[in-house]
Amino acid sequence: MDTERSSEICGNVPDVTLSTPKGKVFSTPKGAHKRTPYSGHTKVNSSFKSPVQTSSTSPAKPEEEIEELKKRRAKLDSEIALLEKDGIRVDELEQHIDLLHEYNDIKDIGQSLVGRIAALRGVTTRDLYGQFGLELDD
């Protein structure tokens, strides 16, 4: 990096001289990121371990995947048939699911409001539940 570009990035900050673990000296603008001090540990370049979990099995072939999806669909169809046999309609289930979603949204908003009121009053939400006559399981 040339001096002109260095001052452009770091402003008019004086340079600082640093040294590496092997005694090599180099300079860097003051305030620039410095390297982690040398720990003396010899295995610096160990193999990288990804935090992403990978399956030990190889990816399924498209034909196998299609068969698995067909089995799953057949199982779901049989469950729907059993529910219909018990007198429950699919559209009724969809309505119940929609109502549960609406209930959960309203409950989340209510809990958020109780939390804000508790923060303003400097008390816990547990205290407010008691004041409002609510059960902690609500």
UniProtKB/Swiss-Prot annotation:
Residues 60-87 form a coiled coil. Residues 21-66 are annotated as: Disordered. The keyword Amino-acid biosynthesis does not apply. Gene3D superfamilies: 1.20.5.170. It is found in: Nucleus. Component of the swi5-sfr1 complex, a complex required for double-strand break repair via homologous recombination. Belongs to the SWI5/SAE3 family. This is DNA repair protein SWI5 homolog. It comes from Salmo salar (Atlantic salmon).
